[in-house]
Amino acid sequence: MRLILLGPPGAGKGTQAAFVTQHFAIPQISTGDMLRAAVKQGTPLGQEAKKVMDAGGLVSDEIIIGLVQDRLKQPDCANGYLFDGFPRTIPQADALKSAGVALDYVVEIEVPEDDIIERMSGRRVHPASGRSYHVRFNPPKQEGLDDVTGEPLVQRDDDREDTVRNRLAVYQKQTRPLVDYYASWAQAGDGKAPKYRKISGVGAVDDIKARLFQALAS
Protein backbone atom coordinates (compact mmCIF):
# COMPACT_ATOMS: atom_id res chain seq x y z
CA MET A 1 0.00 0.00 0.00
CA ARG A 2 1.65 3.19 -1.24
CA LEU A 3 -0.30 6.36 -0.69
CA ILE A 4 -0.49 10.09 -0.13
CA LEU A 5 -3.00 11.69 2.25
CA LEU A 6 -3.98 15.20 1.21
CA GLY A 7 -6.08 17.72 3.07
CA PRO A 8 -5.85 21.08 4.79
CA PRO A 9 -4.15 21.61 8.15
CA GLY A 10 -6.51 20.44 10.89
CA ALA A 11 -8.27 17.89 8.64
CA GLY A 12 -7.13 15.01 10.87
CA LYS A 13 -4.52 13.56 8.48
CA GLY A 14 -2.13 12.70 11.32
CA THR A 15 -4.76 10.71 13.21
CA GLN A 16 -5.84 8.77 10.11
CA ALA A 17 -2.24 8.23 8.95
CA ALA A 18 -1.53 6.44 12.24
CA PHE A 19 -4.42 3.99 11.57
CA VAL A 20 -3.21 3.29 8.02
CA THR A 21 0.46 2.75 8.89
CA GLN A 22 -0.49 0.41 11.74
CA HIS A 23 -2.99 -1.58 9.65
CA PHE A 24 -0.71 -2.09 6.64
CA ALA A 25 2.56 -2.20 8.65
CA ILE A 26 4.10 0.57 6.53
CA PRO A 27 6.20 3.58 7.56
CA GLN A 28 4.92 7.14 7.59
CA ILE A 29 7.42 9.14 5.58
CA SER A 30 7.79 12.75 6.60
CA THR A 31 10.21 14.94 4.68
CA GLY A 32 10.98 16.86 7.89
CA ASP A 33 12.04 13.66 9.67
CA MET A 34 14.06 12.56 6.63
CA LEU A 35 15.87 15.89 6.46
CA ARG A 36 16.76 15.82 10.16
CA ALA A 37 17.97 12.20 9.92
CA ALA A 38 20.10 12.88 6.80
CA VAL A 39 21.68 15.95 8.40
CA LYS A 40 22.37 14.01 11.62
CA GLN A 41 23.90 11.07 9.71
CA GLY A 42 25.96 13.45 7.57
CA THR A 43 24.96 11.76 4.28
CA PRO A 44 25.99 13.62 1.08
CA LEU A 45 22.42 14.89 0.61
CA GLY A 46 22.23 15.70 4.32
CA GLN A 47 25.39 17.82 4.11
CA GLU A 48 23.99 19.62 1.08
CA ALA A 49 20.68 20.26 2.87
CA LYS A 50 22.48 21.49 6.01
CA LYS A 51 24.39 24.12 4.00
CA VAL A 52 21.12 25.47 2.59
CA MET A 53 19.31 25.42 5.95
CA ASP A 54 22.24 27.04 7.79
CA ALA A 55 22.08 29.87 5.26
CA GLY A 56 18.35 30.24 5.99
CA GLY A 57 17.30 28.93 2.58
CA LEU A 58 14.64 26.43 1.51
CA VAL A 59 15.86 22.96 0.63
CA SER A 60 15.40 22.33 -3.10
CA ASP A 61 12.93 19.80 -4.49
CA GLU A 62 15.90 18.01 -6.06
CA ILE A 63 17.43 17.31 -2.63
CA ILE A 64 14.04 16.31 -1.18
CA ILE A 65 13.37 13.84 -4.02
CA GLY A 66 16.87 12.40 -3.56
CA LEU A 67 16.13 11.87 0.13
CA VAL A 68 12.78 10.26 -0.70
CA GLN A 69 14.42 7.84 -3.15
CA ASP A 70 17.07 6.89 -0.57
CA ARG A 71 14.39 6.39 2.08
CA LEU A 72 12.24 4.15 -0.14
CA LYS A 73 15.17 1.74 -0.64
CA GLN A 74 15.11 0.87 3.06
CA PRO A 75 13.65 -2.56 3.98
CA ASP A 76 10.70 -1.18 5.98
CA CYS A 77 9.28 0.26 2.74
CA ALA A 78 8.96 -3.19 1.11
CA ASN A 79 5.18 -3.33 1.82
CA GLY A 80 4.59 0.31 0.97
CA TYR A 81 4.67 3.74 2.56
CA LEU A 82 2.53 6.73 3.44
CA PHE A 83 3.73 10.22 2.52
CA ASP A 84 3.11 12.79 5.22
CA GLY A 85 3.10 16.44 4.14
CA PHE A 86 4.65 15.61 0.79
CA PRO A 87 4.37 16.48 -2.04
CA ARG A 88 3.25 20.02 -1.18
CA THR A 89 3.53 21.58 -4.63
CA ILE A 90 2.98 20.68 -8.30
CA PRO A 91 6.76 20.76 -9.06
CA GLN A 92 7.32 18.24 -6.23
CA ALA A 93 4.54 16.01 -7.58
CA ASP A 94 6.07 16.23 -11.07
CA ALA A 95 9.51 15.36 -9.70
CA LEU A 96 8.03 12.38 -7.83
CA LYS A 97 6.36 11.21 -11.05
CA SER A 98 9.56 11.67 -13.11
CA ALA A 99 11.55 9.72 -10.50
CA GLY A 100 9.14 6.81 -11.02
CA VAL A 101 8.02 6.68 -7.37
CA ALA A 102 5.06 4.27 -7.36
CA LEU A 103 1.75 5.22 -5.75
CA ASP A 104 -1.45 3.20 -5.36
CA TYR A 105 -3.77 5.84 -3.89
CA VAL A 106 -4.07 9.54 -3.29
CA VAL A 107 -6.78 10.22 -0.71
CA GLU A 108 -8.10 13.70 -0.05
CA ILE A 109 -9.65 14.31 3.37
CA GLU A 110 -12.13 17.11 2.84
CA VAL A 111 -13.24 19.36 5.70
CA PRO A 112 -15.03 22.72 5.24
CA GLU A 113 -12.90 25.72 6.16
CA ASP A 114 -15.28 26.91 8.90
CA ASP A 115 -15.05 23.51 10.62
CA ILE A 116 -11.25 23.65 10.57
CA ILE A 117 -11.20 27.15 12.02
CA GLU A 118 -13.56 26.02 14.79
CA ARG A 119 -11.51 22.85 15.46
CA MET A 120 -8.17 24.61 15.63
CA SER A 121 -9.00 27.99 17.15
CA GLY A 122 -10.98 26.28 19.93
CA ARG A 123 -7.98 24.32 21.23
CA ARG A 124 -6.61 25.22 24.66
CA VAL A 125 -3.61 23.68 26.41
CA HIS A 126 -2.16 23.46 29.90
CA PRO A 127 1.50 24.28 29.16
CA ALA A 128 3.07 22.44 32.12
CA SER A 129 1.37 19.05 31.53
CA GLY A 130 0.48 19.22 27.83
CA ARG A 131 -3.17 18.43 28.64
CA SER A 132 -5.37 19.72 25.88
CA TYR A 133 -8.99 20.84 25.77
CA HIS A 134 -11.40 22.29 23.28
CA VAL A 135 -13.82 25.08 24.16
CA ARG A 136 -16.67 23.28 22.40
CA PHE A 137 -15.79 19.59 21.95
CA ASN A 138 -13.84 18.88 25.16
CA PRO A 139 -14.25 21.84 27.53
CA PRO A 140 -12.57 22.01 30.95
CA LYS A 141 -14.84 21.76 34.01
CA GLN A 142 -14.23 25.43 34.68
CA GLU A 143 -13.85 27.74 31.71
CA GLY A 144 -10.23 28.62 30.94
CA LEU A 145 -8.76 26.49 33.75
CA ASP A 146 -7.00 23.10 33.83
CA ASP A 147 -9.13 20.35 35.45
CA VAL A 148 -6.26 18.98 37.55
CA THR A 149 -4.31 22.03 38.73
CA GLY A 150 -6.80 24.86 38.22
CA GLU A 151 -4.05 26.76 36.39
CA PRO A 152 -4.92 28.93 33.38
CA LEU A 153 -5.12 27.35 29.93
CA VAL A 154 -3.52 29.04 26.94
CA GLN A 155 -4.18 29.19 23.22
CA ARG A 156 -1.04 28.36 21.21
CA ASP A 157 -0.02 30.89 18.56
CA ASP A 158 -0.50 28.16 15.92
CA ASP A 159 -4.14 27.85 16.92
CA ARG A 160 -5.04 31.54 16.77
CA GLU A 161 -7.75 32.20 14.18
CA ASP A 162 -5.61 34.57 12.09
CA THR A 163 -2.76 32.01 11.99
CA VAL A 164 -5.18 29.22 11.02
CA ARG A 165 -6.63 31.38 8.23
CA ASN A 166 -3.11 32.13 6.94
CA ARG A 167 -2.21 28.43 6.93
CA LEU A 168 -5.42 27.61 5.07
CA ALA A 169 -4.64 30.33 2.50
CA VAL A 170 -1.17 28.83 1.93
CA TYR A 171 -2.74 25.38 1.55
CA GLN A 172 -5.30 26.65 -1.00
CA LYS A 173 -2.58 28.33 -3.03
CA GLN A 174 0.20 25.73 -2.87
CA THR A 175 -1.19 22.31 -2.05
CA ARG A 176 -4.85 22.37 -3.10
CA PRO A 177 -3.82 22.29 -6.83
CA LEU A 178 -2.38 18.80 -6.15
CA VAL A 179 -5.92 17.51 -5.70
CA ASP A 180 -6.73 18.50 -9.31
CA TYR A 181 -3.32 17.23 -10.47
CA TYR A 182 -3.89 13.71 -9.13
CA ALA A 183 -7.60 13.62 -9.98
CA SER A 184 -6.94 14.52 -13.63
CA TRP A 185 -3.98 12.11 -13.87
CA ALA A 186 -6.25 9.29 -12.63
CA GLN A 187 -8.99 10.28 -15.11
CA ALA A 188 -6.51 10.27 -18.00
CA GLY A 189 -6.37 6.48 -17.77
CA ASP A 190 -2.58 6.24 -17.31
CA GLY A 191 -1.83 2.80 -15.83
CA LYS A 192 0.81 4.31 -13.55
CA ALA A 193 -1.57 6.88 -12.07
CA PRO A 194 -2.64 6.31 -8.47
CA LYS A 195 -6.35 5.94 -7.77
CA TYR A 196 -7.77 9.22 -6.50
CA ARG A 197 -10.36 9.10 -3.70
CA LYS A 198 -12.08 11.85 -1.72
CA ILE A 199 -13.60 11.30 1.72
CA SER A 200 -15.30 13.58 4.22
CA GLY A 201 -13.21 14.33 7.30
CA VAL A 202 -16.24 15.52 9.29
CA GLY A 203 -17.64 13.42 12.14
CA ALA A 204 -16.34 10.91 14.67
CA VAL A 205 -12.76 9.68 14.25
CA ASP A 206 -13.93 6.06 13.82
CA ASP A 207 -16.44 7.05 11.12
CA ILE A 208 -13.71 8.85 9.18
CA LYS A 209 -11.43 5.82 9.62
CA ALA A 210 -14.18 3.55 8.20
CA ARG A 211 -14.58 5.87 5.18
CA LEU A 212 -10.83 5.89 4.61
CA PHE A 213 -10.46 2.09 4.70
CA GLN A 214 -13.47 1.73 2.40
CA ALA A 215 -11.79 4.13 -0.06
CA LEU A 216 -8.56 2.10 0.10
CA ALA A 217 -10.47 -1.09 -0.70
CA SER A 218 -12.19 0.31 -3.79
Curated annotation (Swiss-Prot):
Keywords: ATP-binding, Cytoplasm, Kinase, Nucleotide biosynthesis, Nucleotide-binding, Transferase. It is found in: Cytoplasm. The keyword Chaperone does not apply. ATP binds at residues 10-15, 123, 132-133, 203. It is an enzyme of class 2 (transferase). GO terms for biological process: AMP salvage. It comes from the Bacteria. Residues 30-59 are annotated as: NMP. Its main location: cytoplasm. Residues 122-159 are annotated as: LID. Signal peptide: none annotated. Monomer. Catalyzes the reversible transfer of the terminal phosphate group between ATP and AMP. Plays an important role in cellular energy homeostasis and in adenine nucleotide metabolism. Consists of three domains, a large central CORE domain and two small peripheral domains, NMPbind and LID, which undergo movements during catalysis. The LID domain closes over the site of phosphoryl transfer upon ATP binding. Assembling and dissambling the active center during each catalytic cycle provides an effective means to prevent ATP hydrolysis. Belongs to the adenylate kinase family. This is Adenylate kinase.
